[in-house]
């Protein structure tokens, strides 16, 4: 077993986006849970450009003395994982725990994650027990998990559950990565030597709706596909070769059939020509779209713009970094 530094402080990072209804209960339950820890703790809540009163409520919570709350206000919405990275940049705990603000994963699980990490793990993942989501979200999640496992070779049952714990050296390694599109559980596993996944409770969403719509889930799948591997580019070569061979064989078959049955059978070749043409055009558009995804990500990385811009930090205990360092 690897030798780990003792956990003296725990940081809990929570991205917040339009969660004003759940925030009072979230703060109360998370603070109560953290008070059970033997270690020092801090709560870092990152407002990801909310349009409701979430940012104001976070600032008020951070201004309460001895509340151990730090509020980070981003100037606009950058997405869940960018908001979490902003929280990582502020956190100074030996163990950093991420938690969603919707209370579907109970904050009461935090002490168990800390205890598990103390057993000598770099990353403590979680798997939702009796998941309270729609059939569509469960199915999409299974597809994404299978795709991630295939691409990374790391088998974990629930990459979509953000209730996770990361050792300090994993956080430091992730902060050195500056790609624009980041999926934190996968990024962490690329640096982790020892990982474990434990079951945690999962509740129905009590307030509001999920922030991941159908279109956002589709975008997430594209992000994961193009961030994880270049296998789709290699697949294009295989598909192109198969289409070329199939086209050649079909052409030979049509010539033979025309010689046997005559021009009337082939309808002068018009419909056959259209069928082959549409097949090739469809394959080309798919290939162009996929190549465009990769080129677009290269373009975004080359521009080297920050993942996020911090408008304000309230309750800060370390020097304010107004934006991520590149």
UniProtKB/Swiss-Prot annotation:
Keywords: Antibiotic resistance, Cell inner membrane, Cell membrane, Glycosyltransferase, Lipid A biosynthesis, Lipid biosynthesis, Lipid metabolism, Lipopolysaccharide biosynthesis, Membrane, Transferase, Transmembrane, Transmembrane helix. Its EC number is 2.4.2.53. It is found in: Cell inner membrane. It is a multi-pass membrane protein. The chain crosses the membrane at residues 236-256, 270-290. It comes from Proteus mirabilis (strain HI4320). This is Undecaprenyl-phosphate 4-deoxy-4-formamido-L-arabinose transferase. It holds the Pfam family Glycos_transf_2. Catalyzes the transfer of 4-deoxy-4-formamido-L-arabinose from UDP to undecaprenyl phosphate. The modified arabinose is attached to lipid A and is required for resistance to polymyxin and cationic antimicrobial peptides. The gene is arnC.
């Amino acid at each position: 077993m690897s030798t780990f530094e003792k956990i003296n402080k725990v940081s809990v990072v929570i991205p917040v986006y339009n969660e004003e209804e759940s925030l009072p209960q979230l703060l109360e339950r998370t603070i109560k849970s953290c008070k059970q820890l033997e270690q020092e703790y801090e709560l870092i809540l990152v407002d990801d450009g909310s349009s409701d009163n979430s940012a104001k409520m976070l600032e008020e919570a951070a201004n309460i003395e001895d509340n151990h709350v730090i509020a980070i206000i981003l100037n606009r919405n950058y997405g869940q994982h960018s908001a979490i990275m902003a929280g990582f940049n502020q956190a100074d705990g030996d163990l950093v725990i991420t938690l969603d603000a919707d209370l579907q994963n109970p904050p009461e699980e935090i002490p168990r994650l800390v205890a598990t990490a103390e057993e000598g793990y770099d990353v403590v993942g979680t798997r939702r027990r009796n998941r309270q989501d729609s059939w569509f979200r469960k199915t999409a999640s299974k597809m994404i998990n299978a795709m991630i496992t295939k691409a990374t070779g790391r088998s974990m049952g629930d990459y979509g559950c953000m209730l996770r714990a990361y050792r300090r050296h994993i956080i430091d390694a992730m902060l050195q990565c500056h790609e624009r599109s980041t999926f934190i559980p996968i990024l962490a596993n690329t640096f982790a030597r020892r990982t474990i996944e434990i079951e945690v409770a999962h509740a129905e969403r009590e307030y509001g709706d999920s922030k991941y719509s159908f279109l956002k889930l589709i975008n997430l799948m594209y992000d994961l596909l193009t961030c994880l591997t270049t296998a789709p580019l290699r697949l294009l070569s295989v598909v192109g070769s198969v289409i070329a061979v199939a086209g050649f064989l079909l052409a030979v078959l049509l010539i033979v059939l025309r010689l046997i049955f005559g021009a009337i059978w082939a309808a002068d070749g018009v419909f056959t020509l259209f069928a082959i043409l549409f097949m090739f055009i469809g394959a080309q558009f798919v290939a162009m779209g996929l190549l465009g995804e990769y080129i677009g990500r290269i373009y975004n990385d080359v521009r080297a713009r920050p993942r996020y811009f911090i408008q304000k930090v309230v309750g800060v205990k370390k020097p304010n970094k107004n934006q991520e360092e590149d």
